[in-house]
Amino acid sequence: DKPGQWGASYEINGNKYYFGNIHFLTGSSGNTINYAIIKNGTKGIQIDNHVDDETTLTLSNTVISNMSISGIYAQTTNLDVCNTLIYNCDYYAAALTLGGKYNFVHTTLVNYAARHLMPSLVINNHYTRDDEFHVYDLEAHFANSVIHGSLASELMIDEALDYDTQFDFQFENCLLKVDPRFVMDDTTLFKNIVSAPTDLPRFVNPAEGDFRLDTLSAAKDRGNPAYLIDYPLDLDGVERDSLPDLGAYERIEQ
């Protein structure tokens, strides 16, 4: 497995730009990816601007790994993700940029790649082009998920302040690796968060791409059972119990 083996790029004025390996262009909607393995490229999936309220992409039961840039690169789009594992991307597991609407449930976003340079998850609502500053509305919800990796903090929230735009996000029943100085006192934004330095996900064998939970994982039994109605099975097709685990996998003790 080697990142960057596939994916198109182009160059303008000495700057190199990369397409997504699977690329949904502006205006595309109603797309579904289910039970897929996407690996060894530049950007696993890129989703460009949506033009209405319809979901651009529903991504479920999928593994994305070993990308030289990002697993997901989204721009002002409408994206639903569940039962999905994204790991070992050189920059981001998921970069949710230029605003948009995002819903992640029972996902595992982790980065232990040797060249891991940026947090596993980045949320952003702005960019500058030709000296003009652009700001977009953002709604993002993460539930029963794991965000972890080898950096001191695996979450970046990049909001343009003092602009009359919507910037709403919530992390609910998630295991987050963040810097100890990261403030999560607002329970409307961070609800039932597992984040102490000793709260480790303890995956079975991350070096071999096995991100199922070990018996001592801090992610066990920490999920909100309200999501069992829509997500009763994990990425392996295992039935979740009445106290679901965080992330894409449910651990069933033998």
Predicted regions span which residues?
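Conserved beta-loop-beta connector loops within the AMP-binding
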Residues: F211-R212, R240
